[in-house]
Every structure is written in C-alpha cells, then in structure tokens.
C-alpha cells in the first residue's frame, strides 16, 4: 500500500497494476507485452481494432490500456512539476505537514488570504483618505492624499522593476496561463496607458501656468504617476500571463500593493471627473469668499491654460479605464501565483475576419456615425450653457432608437446559441451512429480476412455467430462509453495532473459584468421613480421614462447573451481538439466517402454561427457609441432637472457619481467580451 507522500502519477500506476491483478490475473505490463493488441475505446481507432477473446476480457483490457496511456501522459508531461527539486511553496503555519503537495496547496491558500487582507485594508485606508479630501470641506488637504498615493506608486514601481529584472530571469520561475492577457486587453492597456501619460503631461502644464496656487505637490504627483504608468504598462504587457513559481510571498504582496494603488488612482480620477461635472453647483452654493478663492486658481477661457485643462478633462475616461484594466490583469496574476497547472498545448489563435459578416458592421457603423453627430451637436450646446429642448429630444430619441435593436439582437443571439447547441448535439449523434456502423463493418471484414488467411472454412451458420458476437461485443463497448460519460471519466476530462484547468479570467469577466451593471440599473430605477412621481408629464418626461426602461431591458438581455456566449465557448474548449484531429487523421479514404456531409463540412459558416457573429459585431459597435455618450462631455442626467427636483442636488449627484463610472466600465468591458465572442463563434 503506497503512502500519501508519493506523487500522484506513481499512485495512479499502482492502482492500475492492482486493478489488473484483481480482474485479469495479470499485470498491465504483461497485457501490453502480448502480441494481440488490446483495442481502444476511442472512435478514432475504428478500422484498427481486432476481435477480443471474450467481451468481459475485452472491457478489462481496454481499461488497462487506457490507464497505461494516462500514466504515460502524466509521467511525460506533468511529473516534473512535483519533482523533489522544484519550487513548492512553504508556509510557517503549515510546517508540520509532511506531504509536499499538500503543504504547497495549504501554503498557497494561506498566502492568498493574508495578501488579500493586506490589499483590502490598504484599499479601505486609501479610499478613506482620498474621499475625505472631497467630503471634509478642505479639512483634509489634497496634498496629504497626493503624498500617500506617491508613496504607493513609488513602492509599486520598485516591486515591478524587481519582478521584471530579477524574478522573471530565474530558471523555472514562471509558467504561463494562456487564457490570461488577451491581445485586445493588452492593446487597450497600451492605448489607455499612453492617454494616461498625456493626461499627466497636461496636468503638469496646467499647474505650471496657474498663478497664486500651490503647484509643487501637483507637479511631483503627476511626475511620479508618469513613471508608475510607464513601468506598470511594461510589467503587464510582459508578465500578465505569468504563473510565478518563486518568491511567492513577495510577488503576492507586491501585486496586491500595485492593485490597491490602481484602485485608489481610479477613485481619485472618478472624484476629479465628478467634481468637474459638479463645478457649477459647487460654485452656486459657495460663499463669496470661497468663490473668490476658487476664481484665483481658474484659467481664463481664452488662454493656453484653459486649453490644457480641457485636454486633461477629455482624457479622464481613458485614465479611469486604464486603472480598471490594470486592476483586472493584476488580480489574474495574483490568482496565478504558485499555480502549477499546465495546458497540453497552446490554445488556438483566432484571427479577426469579416468574411460573410455584412449586416452587423454595416448597421452598426451607420448607428455610430449618427450617434457621433448627435453627440457633437449636444456637447456644443452644453458647452455654451444653453441646451434646447430639441437637443434633449434628439439625444434621448437616438438612444431609444439604438437600444431597441440592441435588445432584439441580444435575444436573437441567445436563441441562435440554443439552436447551435441543438445542431451540434444532432451532428454528434449522427457522427457517432455513422462511426458505429463503420466499426461493425470493419470488424466483420477483419474476421473474414482472418478466416481466409488461416485457410479455415466457415459456414453460413458460423458467419452469423461471428456477426452476432461482434454485435454483442460492440454493444458492450458502447454501453461502457455511455456509462463513463454519465459518471464522468476523470482521467480523460482533466487537463492537468492536479485537476481540471481553471480559467480565472473568464470567471472574473462574469463577475465584473454583473458588478458594473448595477450602476446603470440603479440610475435607471431612480429615474423611473422620479419621472412617475413628477407631474405633469411632458415630452421630456416620457422620453426619460422610456429611455430608462429600455436601458434596463438592454442591460439584462445583453448580459444574458454574453454569459450564454461565454458558456458556449467554455463548452467548446472542454472538448479535446487533439482527439478529434487524431480521429480524422485515422479515417481512410473509404471511410471519408462513407462519412456524412455534416462531418466533412465543419468549416462551413452555418446560419447559427453567422447570426451570433452578426449580433456580436452590431452590439460591439453600439456599446462603443454608448461608451462615448457616457464617458465624454456633459450628460443630460446632470442637466435635465427631473431627478434633481425629487431627490435634491446632493443625493442625485452622489447617485450619478457612483453609477456613471460603473456604467462606463460596463460598456467598455462588454466591447472586449463581445470581441472575444465574435472571434470564437
């Protein structure tokens, strides 16, 4: 009986030999040394199997052969991960644990717990400091929060350089998670990072041109932010796929420090952006002395200082998105620290193509052009301070026009996914039936060839017995496969030596999608209540009510479509592409002629796939337009006055300042996921 300290592969080999001794009376090694090859259960081996001596021994031999294959896979690909010389994680709390792999798992969980608590407390502390500047009526000076953030950015930059220059250069220090760090995410990281650096440059120029204001701390803060953004962008571009196997504690705490810094910078940018939106209200409620003090640090509208201010105000949405993207990538890196799972091979690369996709890009492009025209026209009037009723009607009318088709497209995409799943199930059953008949024919032909080569005469009655026996043998094989499918064949569906390959990126995407959707849903429900209570109803009230209701339906339907699409992608990734490729390679020319058209026409873009691609492309373009409407310039929710009359300026502005940043992130995050859906469909 083996002890638990032995590696998993050796235990599996021992169980394999024990099973063979109990049921066959012979070891698996002896079974493999026979001249008679044991047939495999895989359908790709049709045409290569030989009849066994007895159905029961056939099933036993098959299971023995499969276990041997799994042992080879485990030994060749994954045994090196748990070898004694490798870097297993240790923890002082679990020092009495004598099993290395168990100690590694417990130490990993303990490291996640303490580093997570460290990051959480740091976020709460920094969030209190940053928000106190805006809520304490200048009792907490802004330079205190800037000094705190400067310390965090410097420490994070030092850790990032240490990770890039020291940890990653050691042998065996890094494995890779191929699910993390999608190309569209890295491209967004680079673009938004450049925009954040430009924002800091504009802030420095704006601070230098101000007079009678304290500018030294502002210059220091934005200079350090430029260094931090540059180092962090390089770190995440290079290391976003890393599964670090050395210096686990330093890496976890460094990642949490950097992640907390990004969250606090995001909160600072959200507060600054909200204060720019609320500036007129703050000035109207302030005293004369406060207004004079605020006017001393304002730029004339016709100066270069005013132009730089408009520049960094325009860059706020990019900086907000940059901080959130960095936080998501860092969270995946933190989850992957100490992870000792490896894929069999790299996942397939998907290229962006518009072949056969016409209506989605065409209609979406038209909606984008019209939306930009409406947006520019509204912002011109909002900048002048006088927004006409016609501009409100055009703004809300345009949103209603695009929201209704987005709802229809989301529902159509969900239906297309269900039809596609049904079609794939039918093709799988058809292919299995055809392969079964091919197997029966091959078994019969092999029996006849064997009889003729041995010179033995077979009567018609003997042929019927052989065919009946072959059918019985095949029925036993088929029942065994169905039983394994129902109970779950753990040796086949696990991609790693420690279990099923986890995809932390996809789980995080779904979580962020749900959390960010709460912002717009809350705003919409508050708007609906305010519109219903306010009397009498006007055209603007009706448009606001309809727009809020359509937004709720659109968020719910699009979220369901995205989740259903990601589930479909996950189901496709669970299938073994190498197994199917091997099966197709083993098909002879005669079998290809006998195969149904559905098996040979796999590259054809079916109706359900085309519908999913069309819907994903249209929704992606419309979400880009909705992101532009919510992220840039003035927003009608600040200016129409319906909700402000019911809730008051302070409460309504607080609702908007919390909900709108989440809504903006939802749109941008949806664009990335919809692009992934389009590529995988």
From Swiss-Prot:
Pfam families per record: Otopetrin
Effect seen on changing residue 669 to A/Q: Abolishes proton channel activity
Predominant location category: membrane
Reactions catalysed, semicolon-separated, are: H(+)(in) = H(+)(out)
An example GO biological process term is: proton transmembrane transport
Keywords for the protein's UniProt record, in alphabetical order: Cell membrane, Hydrogen ion transport, Ion channel, Ion transport, Membrane, Transmembrane, Transmembrane helix, Transport
UniProt xrefs under InterPro entries: Otopetrin
Q: Which residues lie on this side of the membrane: Extracellular?
A: 134-143, 205-216, 272-317, 379-392, 530-540, 633-651
Query: Does Cell inner membrane show up as a keyword for this record?
Result: no
Q: How does this protein lie in the membrane?
A: Multi-pass membrane protein
As given in the record, the signal peptide range reads none
Q: Which residues form a coiled coil?
A: none
Instruction: Report one GO cellular component.
Output: plasma membrane
Location in the cell reads: Cell membrane
Which positions, given as ranges, span the membrane? Answer: 113-133, 144-166, 183-204, 217-240, 249-271, 318-334, 359-378, 393-415, 508-529, 541-563, 615-632, 652-674
Spell out the Basic and acidic residues composition-biased ranges.
Answer: 1-25
Q: Which GO terms describe its molecular function?
A: identical protein binding; proton channel activity
Q: Belongs to which family? A: Belongs to the otopetrin family.
Q: What does this protein do?
A: Proton-selective channel gated by extracellular protons.
PANTHER family noted in UniProt: PROTON CHANNEL OTOP, PROTON CHANNEL OTOP3
* Subunit-structure text: Homodimer.
Recorded protein name is Proton channel OTOP3
* Organism whose genome encodes this protein: Xenopus tropicalis (Western clawed frog)
- The gene that this protein is the product of is otop3
